[in-house]
Amino acid sequence: MQVLLVEDDQTLFQELKKELEHWDFFVTGIDDFSAVMDIYEETNPEIVIMDVQLPKYDGFYWCRKIRQVSNVPILFLSSRDNPMDQVMSMELGADDYMQKPFHTNVLIAKLQAIYRRVYEFGAEEKRTLNWQDALVDLSKDSIQKGDSVIYLSKTEMIILEMLIQKQNQIVTRDTLITALWDDEAFVSDNTLTVNVNRLRKKLSDIGMDTQIETKVGKGYMAHE
């Protein structure tokens, strides 16, 4: 697995690089933190590990840049004890977030889970779902309604797929969290809310934001 590790703390970078390579990850680092996108495009990584606090521009800036061209999984690292950093990372389309210090075994487990979810899922035959008058392409993470197309993150698509498969039924928040993350203890309840709100915002671009209903205290429901 090719990993781009965007971390300016060289001691931590070397520790993580050594551990990741022990697990057969191929790790590329950054020398020039004003050229993160150049390195990203050269290496075409399968997963990006991104520190929040970086020289030149912060990790959120680079996440925005990457999301303009790719849905590659992004996992944020941060030493700041600020819940809004986690909220911001989810709003920008990151796949996971870890606060320093952390155990490397947990990082490895998260990376392996992300890889299975994104690439083994993506390797399946093309699958589509018809939802109302829209075509949901699970292999491309896209929704087409008429001539309009929107693209979702992997997390948003997993949420939408679960809701569509149980149309007019309530899917509980716990069910969604369990499906999205292997260990729900590492996920705040607010993280799911952020992802659903971001999904609704994208659906609003094709006039479908009202088709996902919040059931207060329970979960969410997609209408037929």
Swiss-Prot record:
Keywords: Activator, Antibiotic resistance, Cytoplasm, DNA-binding, Phosphoprotein, Repressor, Transcription, Transcription regulation, Two-component regulatory system, Virulence. It holds the Pfam family Trans_reg_C. CDD domains: REC_OmpR_NsrR-like (cd18159), trans_reg_C (cd00383). Member of the two-component regulatory system GraR/GraS involved in resistance against cationic antimicrobial peptides (CAMPs). GO terms for molecular function: phosphorelay response regulator activity; transcription cis-regulatory region binding. Residues 2-115 form the Response regulatory domain. This is Response regulator protein GraR. The gene is graR. PROSITE patterns: OMPR_PHOB (PS51755), RESPONSE_REGULATORY (PS50110).
